[in-house]
Curated annotation (Swiss-Prot):
Residues binding substrate, per UniProt: 195-198
Domain of life per record: Eukaryota
Record-listed Phosphoserine modification sites: 340, 408
SUPFAM superfamilies on file: NAD kinase/diacylglycerol kinase-like
Signal peptide feature range: none
Reaction equations catalysed: an N-acylsphing-4-enine + ATP = an N-acylsphing-4-enine 1-phosphate + ADP + H(+); N-(hexanoyl)sphing-4-enine + ATP = N-hexanoylsphing-4-enine 1-phosphate + ADP + H(+); N-(acetyl)-sphing-4-enine + ATP = N-(acetyl)-sphing-4-enine-1-phosphate + ADP + H(+); N-hexadecanoylsphing-4-enine + ATP = N-(hexadecanoyl)-sphing-4-enine-1-phosphate + ADP + H(+)
Organism: Mus musculus (Mouse)
Expression across tissues: High level expression in heart, brain, testis and pancreas; low expression in spleen, liver and lung; not detected in skeletal muscle.
Documented EC number(s): 2.7.1.138
Function, as annotated: Catalyzes specifically the phosphorylation of ceramide to form ceramide 1-phosphate. Acts efficiently on natural and analog ceramides (C6, C8, C16 ceramides, and C8-dihydroceramide), to a lesser extent on C2-ceramide and C6-dihydroceramide, but not on other lipids, such as various sphingosines. Shows a greater preference for D-erythro isomer of ceramides. Binds phosphoinositides.
Pfam families referenced in this protein's UniProt entry, alphabetically: CERK_C, DAGK_cat, PH_CERK
Primary location class: cytoplasm
Enzyme class, UniProt record, top EC level: transferase
Protein name: Ceramide kinase
Length: 531
């Protein structure tokens, strides 16, 4: 809060909507309050008292002219009224925020000026607020409304908050990523992306890649310790999927996201690096899915002409195909975290699990640095293999309007782990039951064919790679293929799936995944508990 605690408390009687109100500002609590005060003297706040945290005030404006309100007789007795307007955050239902304002009036010009200067001084002391932002707008994503959403909803709020911007409307894929590699980002307080999860992924890769490049880190090395970026990323949802925004804010509302950016919220989230043969393939923050979700996204890419309905169509087609895939998974359980995938403790703003897990990881890193012990060598990898309908790794709940709980309702945003969900081969009916549970309050992990682990690393190799690496299995493969050929009704998987990496198709028969704890920061605070 900076110098906030040094300011003196203010108590005055002002007018709000033609009603006399007692108004107080308590810098120590960073709180502005007002309540009705029928009598001129001091009064205690009642049930009708309103308040706003100074940190959630957007701006304070001087009001020069007297608005033509339908006034009471008392109002007409006030000569030459002066006023100031406080623009603030107002919470509404379902985690949405709205811009609201309240105007305070007084006949005393000096009193109004004192309030104006005091509030502005407190706002200037909030050093976490951005002043200059670089904005990338995807005009093609979702329903093609990105530019309109920014101009109509976001830009006026940024102007009100005295935030200056440089805007780039992207014209081709990966333009945002390429731009962030090329330009000097030192003059910006953050990067804002207007679009869906694909647009966010571009900015994420650009920010992480540029940071590692500047630090001299080779991101292709699977064991490289990546350097966190100081640049925060803001997401204005305007895409076909807004999973990251929904999971970190609680809604996919553009105005809500803009207000989180304005007040300078900051939330550190985990990022997974995905490698194959010492080559970085991609980074992931939400879903890394093989099998069902991989096939779904691959099929939907061929049907972009269908618009958003392509996801429903491809989902139904993939479900009916009921394809399963064979492979081997090895994973390192996340011993450092205090939570588990089925503990009924969702990640919320100011999350205790994320704080404690981060501290525990830092302690482990210190011990390894001084050679006291290597936690990874002491922990045991677990190995499992079989036939899977889906393999999902989630760094967050992956919640969305259709699935408010998400793929893993109790996954955490910054605990340095990923929830690894294995859906083994089962009947089509049972798989449907599993999918339906994502839309209600029932436990989707409560099936014999579903396993879930909280991990910090995992490797996957498809059966095809294993067979290719082992020449001695060639005859067995031919025998396996002959059996399938002789029995057309056989549903054995003869192909390999693709990966769904945050909504993008990724082709790799084997991958190595590592979670990097709280690697990037967003203009968000996590989902708040609703009263």
């Amino acid at each position: 809060m900076g110098a906030m605690g040094a300011a003196e408390p203010l108590h005055s009687v002002l007018w709000v909507k033609r009603r006399r109100c007692a108004v107080s500002l308590e810098p120590a609590r960073a709180l502005l309050r007002w309540w009705r005060s029928p009598e001129p003297g001091p009064s205690a706040p009642g049930a009708d008292a309103r308040s706003v945290l100074v940190s959630e005030i957007i701006a304070v404006e001087e009001k020069d002219d007297c608005e033509k309100h339908a006034s009471s007789g008392r109002w007409h007795k006030m000569e030459n009224p002066f006023a100031f307007t406080v623009h603030r955050v107002k919470r509404v239902r379902h985690h949405r925020w709205k811009w609201a304002r309240v105007t305070f009036w007084s006949a005393d010009e000096q009193l109004c000026h004192l309030w104006l200067q005091t509030l502005r001084g407190l706002l200037e002391s909030l050093t976490s607020r951005p002043k200059h932002l670089l904005v990338f707008i995807n005009p093609f994503g979702g329903k093609g409304q990105g530019k309109r959403i920014y101009e109509k909803t976001v830009a006026p709020l940024f102007t009100l908050a005295s935030i200056t911007t440089e805007i780039i409307i992207t014209e081709h894929a990966n333009q945002a990523k390429e731009t962030l590699y090329e330009i000097n980002t030192d003059s910006y307080d953050g990067i804002v992306c207007v679009g869906g999860d694909g647009m966010f992924s571009e900015v994420l890769h650009g920010v992480i890649g540029r940071t590692q490049q500047s630090a001299g880190i080779d991101p292709n090395h699977p064991r490289a310790v990546l350097v966190p970026s100081t640049l925060r990323i803001g997401i204005i949802p305007a895409g076909s999927t807004d999973c990251v925004c929904y999971s970190t804010v609680g809604t996919n509302d553009a105005e809500t996201s803009a207000l989180h950016i304005i007040i300078g919220d900051s939330l550190a989230i985990d990022v997974s690096s995905v490698h194959y043969h010492n080559t970085l393939l991609r980074y992931s923050v939400s879903l890394l899915g093989y099998g069902f979700y991989g096939d779904l996204i691959k099929d939907s890419e061929k049907k972009r002409w269908m618009g958003l309905v392509r996801y429903d169509f491809s989902g139904l087609k993939t479900f009916l195909s009921h394809q399963y895939y064979e492979g081997t998974l090895s994973f390192l359980p996340a011993q450092h975290t205090v939570g588990s995938p089925r503990d009924n403790k969702p990640c919320r703003a100011g999350c205790f699990v994320c704080r404690q897990s981060k501290q525990q990881l830092e302690e482990e890193e210190k011990k390894a640095l001084y050679g006291l012990e290597n936690a990874e060598e002491m922990e045991e990898w677990q190995v499992t293999c079989g036939k899977f309908l889906a393999i999902n790794a989630t760094n967050m709940s992956c919640a969305c309007p259709r699935s408010p709980g998400g793929l893993s309702p109790f996954a955490h945003l910054g605990d340095g782990s990923s929830d690894l969900i294995l859906i083994r081969k089962c009947s089509r009916f049972n798989f449907l039951r599993f999918l339906i549970r994502h839309t209600n309050q029932e436990d989707q992990f409560d099936f014999t064919f579903v396993e879930v682990y909280r991990v910090k690393k995992f490797h996957f190799t498809s059966k095809h790679v294993e067979d290719e690496d082992n020449d001695s299995k060639e005859q067995e493969k031919q025998k396996f293929g002959k059996i399938c050929k002789d029995r057309p009704s056989c549903t054995c998987s003869a192909s390999r799936s693709s990966w769904n990496c945050d909504g993008e198709v990724m082709h790799s028969p084997a991958i190595e995944v590592r979670v990097h704890c709280q690697l990037v920061r967003l203009f968000a605070r996590g989902i708040e508990e609703e009263s």
